Amino acid sequence: MAKIVVTGGQALQGEVNISGAKNAVLPILCATLLADAPVQISNVPHLHDVITMVKLLSELGAEVTIDEGTLAKGRSILVDPRSVTHQIAPYELVKTMRASILVLGPLLARYGTAEVSLPGGCAIGSRPVDQHIKGLQALGAEISVENGYIKATSHGRLKGGRYVFDMVSVTGTENVLMAAVLAEGTTVLENAAMEPEVTDLADCMIALGAQIEGAGTPRIVVQGVQRLGGGHHAVLPDRIETGTFLVAAAMTGGSVTVRRARPETLDAMLDKLTEAGATITTTADSITLDMQGKRPRAVSLTTAPYPAFPTDMQAQFMALNCVADGVGVINETIFENRFMHVNELLRLGADIQVEGHTAIVRGAARLSGAPVMATDLRASASLILAGLVADGDTTIDRIYHLDRGYENIEEKLGALGATIQRTA
């Protein structure tokens, strides 16, 4: 099984291009099922989850053509949904990636029927699908859960309605939003997720002919249309990858510019990096972080839905706090079981105390390399970050988690001066 070996001690310097956002491209690929003509998606990252989603679309009968492109420009995917013949997303594919549930709304809206296996693909606690089910029922769907599958049908077109999400759910918002686009009449979604990836999904569907207002706010209004046509959409940059490289620069006392970024989607993260002592300058599509000659200061944070601090950056900032000056308190309010990286960071010499959903991190003068094991996507990133500043070699096992969400991370870090390699 492949591993990554990191040798610590190098301050990162240089520039890095940010890839398309994993959490945007997956729902956007699902949204192509709503169209009745080919849809081209560009700036698609080279990720394992994207490959899985392409397999799922192909399993449903869609014709998918991939232009591999380059690391510099990203890949392009052309989806022709006119050949879709199946409306069942099988367990074999769904179990490896939770985002597979996002075909439920499009299949139901377009074909009046959908069967999607209950999802797997993530070890960071329960992520209930009830928000998806309730939202689709509010549009007139009949839904049952039988034999491990969500089975949804509608008699004729879905009907527009008003739905208030019990809790903020990104994928729940996306699933119901996609279904509402082809529903008859007006749909109002309240307490909707405001993440930039939701806005990007809406922008894609608007380009195909959807009528959506309010994406990026808690209230989204959709005027249903009869059909979506073909078109093109470029995926927005990945704000979590952006944040990960900025934290790497801060931890190593480096100076890094991230290009093809969207600074306006990173306010909470940039505020915390400034609090940690970094000097940050931004342009419309780049961010430069300078921490040369300085040790980061510890920061305290609480994860919450956008625009607050993202749970997907919690592990990386914990790694920063492990070598920072002072004590940082991290409260995780989004997911349970999202401190699984703590035991691995402890193996490197970190000083972390966990009490329920709170981690208290006391900065250590140094970490020392050791063999560690990745437990989920963002945890694996935090271990690489810790390895960048640890004495000696840090060997990270189970890096298949990493390939689900980071495109060529060892190449990108290596280009910034890190000593990092993938081994068989």
From Swiss-Prot:
Pathway: Cell wall biogenesis; peptidoglycan biosynthesis. It catalyses: phosphoenolpyruvate + UDP-N-acetyl-alpha-D-glucosamine = UDP-N-acetyl-3-O-(1-carboxyvinyl)-alpha-D-glucosamine + phosphate. GO terms for molecular function: UDP-N-acetylglucosamine 1-carboxyvinyltransferase activity. The keyword Cytoplasm applies. It comes from Xanthomonas oryzae pv. oryzae (strain KACC10331 / KXO85). Its EC number is 2.5.1.7. Keywords: Cell cycle, Cell division, Cell shape, Cell wall biogenesis/degradation, Cytoplasm, Peptidoglycan synthesis, Pyruvate, Transferase. The active site is at 122 (proton donor). UDP-N-acetyl-alpha-D-glucosamine binds at residues 98, 127-131, 312, 334. Belongs to the EPSP synthase family. MurA subfamily. InterPro entries: Enolpyruvate_Tfrase_dom, Enolpyruvate_Tfrase_sf, MurA_subfamily, RNA3'P_cycl/enolpyr_Trfase_a/b, UDP_GlcNAc_COvinyl_MurA. GO terms for biological process: cell division; cell wall organization; peptidoglycan biosynthetic process; regulation of cell shape; UDP-N-acetylgalactosamine biosynthetic process. This is UDP-N-acetylglucosamine 1-carboxyvinyltransferase. The modification 2-(S-cysteinyl)pyruvic acid O-phosphothioketal is found at residue 122. Phosphoenolpyruvate binds at residues 22-23. GO terms for cellular component: cytoplasm. PANTHER family: UDP-N-ACETYLGLUCOSAMINE 1-CARBOXYVINYLTRANSFERASE. It comes from the Bacteria. Cell wall formation. Adds enolpyruvyl to UDP-N-acetylglucosamine.
